[in-house]
Swiss-Prot record:
Note: The ToBRFV MVP has gained resistance to antiviral Tm-2(2) defense, thereby allowing it to spread from Jordan to most of the world tomato's cultures and pose a major threat to agriculture.
Family: Belongs to the tobamovirus movement protein family.
GO molecular function ontology, one term from the record: DNA binding
Main location group: host cell
InterPro entries: TMV_movement, Viral_movement
Lineage: Viruses, Riboviria, Orthornavirae, Kitrinoviricota, Alsuviricetes
Stated role: Transports viral genome to neighboring plant cells directly through plasmosdesmata, without any budding. The movement protein allows efficient cell to cell propagation, by bypassing the host cell wall barrier. Forms a ribonucleoprotein complex with viral RNA. Binds microtubules and modulates microtubule stability. Can bind double-stranded DNA. Evades host resistance (R) protein (e.g. tomato ToMV resistance protein TM-2(2), AC Q71BG9) in ToMV/TMV resistant plants.
Keyword annotations: Cleavage on pair of basic residues, DNA-binding, Host cell junction, Host cytoplasm, Host cytoskeleton, Host-virus interaction, RNA-binding, Transport, Viral movement protein
Subunit composition and interactions: Binds to host RBCS at the plasmodesmata; this interaction seems required for viral systemic movement.
Annotated stretches, region: Disordered: 211-244
Name this polypeptide is given: Movement protein
């Protein structure tokens, strides 16, 4: 059975100089580099859009920023060996209204691959205020897995590496902001994510899922209000899909270890 790596290494996502690691916080806008605690999603439906807390256990700074440097997603099929079918997993920033821009990364793997893992490098900042609103979601699309309703065929776990900032001033009297170096060890991951994006049409699925759930909500609101509002045009054009690529499950070589990441800081 193919098992996966169970420990998150900060150095796989970011390079910190010795000064950035050991200087007191008053000398740098980087207050801490942290590994979040594990957040888990149990998948019960063929298609679902669920909120995920990528900053679980991370202490945020009031009025500051958080940089999502990296993300490790681990999944396990709760099925017998050699089952058919597979799953597409898509990380979503729900703030973005265009589906293709909301789709941060997508990944596909077969159910026969009992356990899998992939890494993502989002590499962008959000404000503490936005982070407190739980802005990330996971779109899961299970295909051709025949299991009775009400059971859980798949479990997903998420751990992130993030940097907490007091401010984003790049140069100051005694400050220099840290960044992911161009030659960092995870440059390849950004290329891999691009391959996911070009082969897996998860942005199309996200647009359809949002449209479907939006119509259900709109219908309920109209029934509750009792207003005779005009029905939406059934001939309304559907959003065109974007081509995206898939990266097969080829990141996995090691044996899995049970691991819960506690917050870690410099």
């Amino acid at each position: 059975m193919a098992l996966v790596k169970g420990k998150v290494n900060i150095n796989e996502f970011i390079d910190l100089s010795k000064s950035e690691k050991f200087l007191p916080s008053m000398f740098t806008p980087v207050k801490s580099v942290m590994i979040s605690k594990v957040d888990k999603i149990l998948v019960h439906e063929d298609e679902s859009l669920s909120e995920v807390n990528l900053l679980k256990g991370v202490k945020l700074i009031d009025g500051g920023y958080v940089h999502l440097a990296g993300l490790v997603v681990t999944g396990e099929w709760n099925l017998p060996d050699n089952c058919r079918g597979g799953v597409s997993v898509c990380l979503v920033d729900k703030r973005m209204e265009r589906a293709d821009e909301a789709t941060l990364a997508s990944y596909y793997t077969a159910a026969a691959k009992k356990r899998f893992q992939f890494k993502v490098v989002p590499n962008y900042n959000i404000t503490t205020k936005d982070a407190e609103k739980a802005v990330w979601q996971v779109l899961v699309n299970i295909r051709n897995v025949k299991i009775a309703a009400g059971y859980c065929p798949l479990s997903l776990e998420f751990v992130s590496v993030c940097i907490v900032y007091k401010n984003i001033i790049k140069l100051g009297l005694r400050e220099k902001i840290t960044s992911v170096t161009d030659g960092g060890p995870m440059e390849l991951s950004e290329e891999v994510v691009d391959e996911f994006m070009e082969e897996v049409p998860m942005s199309v699925r996200l647009a359809k899922f949002r449209s479907k759930t939006g119509k259900k909500f709109s219908s309920k609101s109209e029934n509750n209000s009792g207003n005779n509002r005009p029905k939406p045009d059934k001939n309304q054009r559907k959003e065109k899909g974007l081509k995206v690529r898939v990266e097969k499950d080829n990141l996995i070589d090691n044996e899995l270890e049970t691991y819960v990441a506690d917050s870690d800081s410099y």
